[in-house]
Amino acid sequence: MKKTVVVFSGGQDSTTCLIQALEQYDEVHCITFNYGQRHKEEIEVAQRVSQLLGATAHKVLDVSLLNELAISSLTRDNIPVPDFKQSEQSDIPSTFVPGRNILFLTLAAIYAYQIGAESVITGVCETDFSGYPDCRDEFVKALNHAVNLGIARDIQFITPLMWLDKAQTWALADYYGKLDFVRHNTLTCYNGIQGDGCGQCAACHLRERGLHGYLQDKNAVMDAMKNKVGLK
């Protein structure tokens, strides 16, 4: 029986990963982290979406200790969330939560170890990403190697979206017939607004630009996505 663990926030990327995983694995376990994020709606949305899609199980872990160390506009009400133009002007935006993916992937691997899952799936990507160093392919591979050494188990970190742009990520959701579901039920917005979001923050801008790009040339984007992912 094939099992996997999806690092799940209830946003566009992790939901698309969950949709694909449900087609590929016998058991799909979601893990969501409460790290004191600015908008608790994220956790509620993640729980609702995983249930609607039919995940095998959904674990929510309290990692609020991260909030004590990682100062970010996603964890502090007194730090404003930058709009897209402000984010573009910074090498690492204030929305970056230092150590977040280090912690999340490590804990997800421990959970995978306990339930006998062969892999951990995460929706990080280098294309159209927000300048976060812990979304890079080299980081994920390096951490995967270190974690496997530490637990003496071969658990694979899988990044289905690593080389897809946002338009192609929308195409992947559409390939599985879930574009409208992802658009209306997920929460990607840094300001905590479900669906199409606030339209001002970097996350909303990338999401909307990707959707527009896909809808403008669906066939070409779909073909490009299939070639990258290896779908027919």
Swiss-Prot record:
Keyword Cell wall biogenesis/degradation: no
Residues that hold Zn(2+) according to the record: C189, C198, C201, C204
Enzyme class: ligase
GO process terms (BP): queuosine biosynthetic process
Pfam families in UniProt: QueC (PF06508)
GO molecular function, one term: ATP binding
Annotated function: Catalyzes the ATP-dependent conversion of 7-carboxy-7-deazaguanine (CDG) to 7-cyano-7-deazaguanine (preQ(0)).
Protein name as it appears in the record: 7-cyano-7-deazaguanine synthase
Organism of origin: Proteus mirabilis (strain HI4320)
